[in-house]
């Protein structure tokens, strides 16, 4: 359609939700390298302890995060967005908030399975949940089968229901697979061990902070886009959606890197570890070069799938060119984070993220976008600076850490 309000509302509601959502997910990601190391060493008992504590701790964390996210609702009017956008965003946002504990329960199982090198199950579960989400959206947004037309709120309800389905499927899988049922044996809140939780936090918090800082740079840029008006906000949503499609592949390469590297690290096989790291860099560079090419050559065509508004399409096509610019550094920094997680060298990624995203990305984007008057594309230029800085600093760190591991061997 040509009315930019619903798209802007979903964009804004999603952006506000995303910041704390990503922080919670980051904490859960800390489980994978720990499980991966134990898996390489064949320690089932400790792995079971990690899973069981993860289930309890992450779900509780999900409730806590949801409470915080609910509390910030009144502040959504203070971010300089058009009032009708915020009005439509809040019911959608509430549905997302209710999904938090279910997301975290799902992630406890997902990160554990990744640690033991099983990524197929999460893929199947995610595909089923996404198909369900699409079906729910068709029903709730447009009000099929005699249900009321819910619009943006319906999109939120569809997401909530699909996020409840995912952990239920995971639990079913674990109980029906002899190989995995043992990990849940004797599961009770009594097994809650503060030492294990501290271990999970020790790995998870720096990852969480890095993801929070990175996400807030993207969200901060999105909020500044809103200052240019609804059309720019919608165009930004299009560019970010397309960017996320490319980024999904990057994220999966990063996650696979963590799994491979953590297994090599657990077996103390540094030669294999270096090979895995190099292969990941080659993969991600090839993919991101391809993505950048598509962004540039298809820049006038892609936005027409999302909007019929000529102004929105024009802005989005410019943004895609600038999104192409930061593809390579985004890929490199993501794989680098994957390697650092795998060798459990995560403390450093937080300060690197702080410098890259808050001291470079956001200020440089503001400088080009507003001070130097480049407009929306100037904001995207900030990403090139921030992501490139992150990529360089992380590579320097990895070279140092791998050299240390070699000497340690």
Task: Map each language-model feature to its residues.
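Small-residue-rich hydrophobic transmembrane alpha-helices
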Residues: 7-66, 70, 103-122, 222, ...
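Residue-level hotspots within pore-lining transmembrane alpha-helices
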Residues: 20-24, 64, 97, 101-102, ...
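Alpha-helical transmembrane segments of multipass membrane proteins
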Residues: 74-75, 108-112, 131, 135-142, ...
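Helix-terminus/linker motif at the lipid-water interface of multi-pass membrane proteins
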Residues: 1-8, 76-83, 139-150, 212-245, ...
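Short runs within selected transmembrane alpha-helices of multi-pass transporters and secretion channels
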Residues: 25-28, 96-114, 122-130, 155-171, ...
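Small-residue hotspots at the loop-to-helix junctions and early N-terminal turns
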Residues: 4-15, 89, 93, 156, ...
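Short alpha-helical transmembrane segments in multi-pass integral membrane proteins
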Residues: 35-101, 147-205, 261-326, 368-409
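Transmembrane helical elements of multi-pass membrane transporters/channels
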Residues: 95, 129, 162-166, 170, ...
């Amino acid at each position: 359609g040509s009315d930019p309000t619903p798209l802007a509302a979903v964009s804004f509601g999603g952006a506000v939700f995303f910041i704390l959502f990503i922080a919670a997910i980051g904490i859960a990601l800390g489980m994978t390298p720990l499980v991966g190391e134990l898996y390489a060493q064949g320690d089932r008992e400790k792995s079971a302890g990690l899973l069981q504590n993860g289930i309890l701790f992450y779900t509780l964390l999900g409730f806590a995060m949801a409470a915080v996210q609910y509390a910030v609702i009144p502040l959504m009017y203070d971010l300089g967005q058009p009032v009708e956008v915020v009005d439509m965003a809040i019911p959608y946002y509430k549905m997302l908030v209710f999904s938090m504990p279910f997301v975290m329960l799902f992630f406890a199982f997902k990160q554990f399975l990744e640690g033991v090198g099983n990524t197929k199950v999460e893929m199947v579960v995610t595909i089923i949940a996404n198909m369900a989400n699409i079906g729910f959206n068709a029903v709730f947004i447009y009000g099929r089968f005699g249900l009321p037309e819910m619009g943006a709120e319906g999109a939120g309800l569809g997401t909530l229901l699909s996020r409840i389905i995912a952990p239920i499927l995971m639990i079913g899988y674990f109980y029906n697979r002899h190989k995995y049922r043992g990990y849940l044996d004797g599961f009770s809140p009594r097994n809650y061990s503060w030492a294990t939780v501290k271990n999970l936090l020790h790995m998870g918090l720096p990852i969480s902070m890095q993801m929070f800082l990175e996400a807030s740079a993207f969200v901060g840029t999105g909020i500044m886009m809103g200052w240019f008006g609804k059309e720019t906000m919608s165009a930004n949503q299009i560019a970010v959606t397309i960017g996320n499609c490319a980024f999904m592949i990057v994220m999966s390469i990063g996650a696979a890197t963590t799994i491979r590297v953590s297994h090599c690290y657990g077996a103390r096989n540094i030669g294999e570890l270096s090979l895995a790291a190099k292969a990941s860099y080659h993969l991600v560079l090839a993919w991101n070069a391809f993505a950048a090419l598509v962004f540039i050559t298809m820049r006038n065509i892609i936005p027409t799938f999302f909007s019929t508004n000529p102004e929105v399409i024009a802005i989005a096509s410019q943004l895609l060119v600038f999104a192409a610019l930061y593809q390579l550094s985004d890929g490199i920094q993501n794989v680098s984070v994957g390697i650092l997680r795998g060798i459990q060298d995560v403390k450093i990624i937080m300060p690197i993220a702080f410098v890259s995203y808050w001291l470079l990305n956001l200020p440089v984007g503001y400088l080009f976008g507003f001070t130097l008057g480049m407009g929306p594309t100037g904001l995207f230029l900030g990403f090139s600076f921030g992501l490139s800085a992150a990529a360089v600093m992380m590579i320097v760190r990895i070279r140092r850490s791998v050299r240390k591991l070699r000497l340690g061997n």
